[in-house]
């Protein structure tokens, strides 16, 4: 209903997708036990355990920039990819609801094949959906984890945040 009402008023909605990490208090990680289900932090048998990188279960896990309340997602895990990209998944569901596009948080932390998969799913639904990436450095010449990125060469993003061009 929000998307429909916004369109009537000439407003388009772009969602901010954080696909690199979750909060430690998300239902998937559930570090503080605030949700009824068993999160990845609580049990190695959790359906979400492989969504994260545990080095020493449960207290030593990869985090975005070492921030322990932001555990890093294992984007190559098949069940996480299904939840994000496949039928009934987050990206398809919201794209099909009529949003105008996506802003991808810390896109330089996402592997290129993952970003291409996101683009494919989004553009198959509607080629005019906008995909913007958050890149803190010069996105036209970015090297991330030792690899040159190709954000703006047609296979990944439509645009980037312009932090370096103040």
Mark where each language-model region is.
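Short beta-strand segments at enzyme active-site cores
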Residues: 13-17, 103-104
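The substrate-binding groove and active-site-proximal loops of carbohydrate-active enzymes
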Residues: 1, 28, 67-83, 99-109
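Active-site-proximal helices and loops of the catalytic beta/alpha 8
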Residues: 3, 21, 30-37, 89-92, ...
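Core domains of carbohydrate- and sulfate-ester-processing enzymes
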Residues: 27-73, 166
């Amino acid at each position: 209903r929000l998307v429909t009402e916004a369109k009537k008023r000439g407003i388009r909605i772009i969602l901010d997708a954080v696909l690199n990490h979750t909060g430690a208090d998300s239902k998937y990680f559930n570090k503080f036990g605030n949700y009824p289900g068993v999160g990845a932090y609580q049990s190695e048998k959790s359906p979400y355990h492989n969504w994260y990188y545990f080095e020493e279960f449960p207290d030593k896990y990869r985090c975005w920039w070492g921030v322990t309340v932001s555990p890093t997602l294992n984007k190559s895990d098949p069940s996480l990819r299904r939840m994000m990209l496949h039928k009934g998944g987050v990206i398809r569901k919201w794209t099909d609801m009529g949003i105008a596009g996506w802003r991808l948080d810390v896109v330089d932390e996402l592997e290129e094949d993952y970003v291409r998969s996101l683009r494919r799913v989004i553009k198959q639904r509607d080629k005019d959906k906008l995909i913007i990436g958050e890149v803190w450095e010069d996105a036209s010449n970015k090297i991330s984890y030792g690899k040159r990125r190709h954000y703006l060469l047609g296979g990944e993003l439509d645009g980037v945040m312009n932090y370096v061009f103040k």
